[in-house]
Structure formats: structure tokens, C-alpha cells
Amino acid sequence: MNINFARQGFAWRSLAMPAVLVLTMLSSHVLAACPTDAAIDAYVADFAAKRISKGFGNDISAVDAECAKKKLSIKLRKVLGQPVGYKAGFTNVALQQRFNVDGPRWGYMYDRDMIDILAVVPAEFGARPLYEADFIVVAKDAGLADAKTPLEALGHIEFLVPFIELPDLMLEGTFSGNAMVATNVAFRGGVLGMEIPVVKSQAFLDALANMTVVMTDENSGKELGRAKGSALMDNPINAAMWLAQDLKKNGIALKRGDLLSLGGYVPPQPTKTGMRVQVKYIGLPGDPAVSVEFN
């Protein structure tokens, strides 16, 4: 991070500032700091061991959370494999309010624990394992970041993919949104459904906003949650556009095949042994679905 200290209006008498002010400024500087490499390594060790972690502090600032995430993105490769895309978090207003963040954030996704279609995974796949109804778009090219309208954006998307994210909220106690961002927005893995071809039409765009995402316990038939497609920034394609644009602002150009996870439709829920969860996207062609079983 480059910080430019303005020198306009500087007066030599400012060197004689009160000691209390000096101490206050120093104190603030100490508190506001990107986590050290040692702290990053400690978190990665906790992550690899699937144990609860103290993370990087609940009071971490948004700037320092981004710094931690960037450092962590390199170290997580030895546990999670190669980068495969990016995940948006807090695209749902309810989750923004729950974690007291002022807008969406994003993290990195990796390939090692991304599983296709009908998946059986350990219920204890992490320190605090959860499942979440999500949705993925597959980028066609970097032009997604420059699209001016959702309809134009569809032309830069290869496929849509039903997705159950398997996040790991492994921080101890309660935690802030910034603390979660610092840990790469809790990404660990997920289950991918069948690819849905994109139709560049207003009708298809409307179907994405109007679809109903339903999460069900397949063993009992109990509904676990539902939301309209519009729960993610009025249309999931808006979430894809936001993510592509924010990545570009951070010097990241999308490439063909990058996965973009768009955020949770309903709050994440804890896994249970023997449970089988289905997420269905009612209103899209064929009402596509994706399932996962926990053993």
C-alpha cells in the first residue's frame, strides 16, 4: 500500500506537537498494521490442521484485512492447490448487516477441494464446517469487467454453474466481517453442478433474477432455506459484474475459465454426519440442482 503524506502548509512548528498527540498517533499506527508473516504462517498451520484459530484479531481494519488476504492467498496454495477463481462475499444485504460490512468483498478460490456434481465429503471437512447455497459463473474473457449492463455481461460469461460452497468459519468466538475477509472469506472448497449454457437475452436475465433457490435436506424432505435470485445484488449477474470490476481495480484480469462464486443465498449452516443436501434453482431451464452428502 502506497501512502502519500501531503506536505502542503507544513510548518516547522508542527515538529513541536504535544506528546499526547504523538503517543496517540504512534498507538494508532501500531494497532493498524498488516499481520506479520509469522501470524500468516500460524493461521495456515491452523487451517491445514483443521483447528479453530484466533485469526488476525476481531478489530482488524478493512485495509489490513485486505493485506492479510493477499499474503494468505500465496501461502494457502500449499494446502488448497492452485487458484481456480474468486469468490464474492457479502453480496447479500442480510449478510452485510449480520457482519457489519458496508458492501461486498472477495477472496480467492483453489482447486483441490472443488468437487463435481454428486459429492460425498466428510462432515468434519474443516474446523467449523458449513454448507451454503451459492452460484457460479464461468468467465469467457476479461471483458466482463468492462460490461456496462447485465445483458452485455452475459456475452462475457461462458456458463452458469449450480454451487454448494463448503466454507470453514474457523475463527474462535464471534467475529467481524473484516476478520472474515482477512481469512480469505472463509473459503475451503465446494461442490459444482452441471454447467448451464448462457443465453444472451433479456428473458434469460429475468429468469436469473426471478428464480427461486431452494435448499433441502434430501433425507427428511425438510426445506432448509430459500431465496429469490434477486437476493444477490438484484440479479446474480450484477454480483458477477461487481466482482470482475473490483478484481480489475486490484490489477487482476479475468481469463477464460475463471470461476466466479457470487455469494450465499441463505445463511451458511453446520454440517451433520449422514445429511444429504440439495440446492435447486427453480425457474432456470430444467430446474438444475446440485447435491452433497456428508459422511
Residue ranges with predicted function:
Residues 184, 278-283:
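Short, exposed beta-strand-loop hairpins at the edges of beta-sheets
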Residues 1-12:
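N-terminal secretory signal peptides that target proteins for export/translocation
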Residues 266-269, 283-286:
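Short, charged beta-turn/beta-strand-edge "cap" motif at the junction between a beta-strand
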Residues 250-254, 260-261:
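C-terminal soluble interaction/assembly domains
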